[in-house]
Amino acid sequence: MDKGNRKKVGLLGGNFNPIHHAHLMMADQVAQQMNLDKVLLMPENIPPHVDEKETISAKHRVKMLELAIKENPRLGLELIEIERGGKSYSYDTLKLLTEANPDTDYYFIIGSDMVEYLPKWYKIDELLKLVTFIALRRKDTISKSPYPVTWLDAPLLPISSTMLREMFAKNIEPTYFLPQNVIDYIKTEKLYKKR
């Protein structure tokens, strides 16, 4: 197929427990700076990491993502890992996506802190044939890797989902850290309350 007719789609994977403005800003900046057709936020079913963390149901995480991105036409959702179930390995996901969408070039967005772990990723050499890695540079990060990585400069917000869950557990509303409609959903559904 003619390279000019190919779609350029970014993927930002994560637990999104909950989604917040740092995730959204990263996805939107990559979409604009790389001139992508869309960036899809891709919630993982079960993270493959050793430090498995407790997460809320996929239903709630997907609903929060839908609320967070509904006003931005550059962002969308990719639910393949939720639908597939089991552990979420990037290689398995990208193999399925590239087979299902042969006219699409995928750009996998990672934080600069993940670049040093690329050698440990499952089937990294095969994954590199399927995707282009995009990393957002932090001031304190050395921008080099033995793997091909496209580095972008974008402001990064020091917000973490862990911090937000702790705030909700203490009954502190994290106004301005995540979209208000997501805060309202979390409060209505009583998510992240101490048991």
From Swiss-Prot:
Record flagged with keyword Nucleotide-binding = yes
Q: Does the keyword Phosphoprotein apply?
A: no
Q: In which pathway does it act?
A: Cofactor biosynthesis; NAD(+) biosynthesis; deamido-NAD(+) from nicotinate D-ribonucleotide: step 1/1
Name the EC number(s).
2.7.7.18
Cite the SUPFAM superfamilies for this sequence: Nucleotidylyl transferase (SSF52374)
InterPro entries named among the record's database cross-references: Cyt_trans-like (IPR004821), NadD/NMNAT (IPR005248), Rossmann-like_a/b/a_fold (IPR014729)
Any Pfam family = CTP_transf_like
Keywords associated with the record: ATP-binding, NAD, Nucleotide-binding, Nucleotidyltransferase, Pyridine nucleotide biosynthesis, Transferase
Q: What are this entry's molecular-function GO terms?
A: ATP binding; nicotinate-nucleotide adenylyltransferase activity
Q: Name one GO biological process term.
A: NAD biosynthetic process
For this protein, what reaction is catalysed? nicotinate beta-D-ribonucleotide + ATP + H(+) = deamido-NAD(+) + diphosphate
Similarity comment: Belongs to the NadD family.
Q: What does this protein do?
A: Catalyzes the reversible adenylation of nicotinate mononucleotide (NaMN) to nicotinic acid adenine dinucleotide (NaAD).
PANTHER family xrefs: NICOTINATE-NUCLEOTIDE ADENYLYLTRANSFERASE-RELATED, PHOSPHOPANTETHEINE ADENYLYLTRANSFERASE
Descriptive protein name: Probable nicotinate-nucleotide adenylyltransferase
**UniProt source species:** Lactococcus lactis subsp. lactis (strain IL1403)
* Gene assigned in the entry: nadD
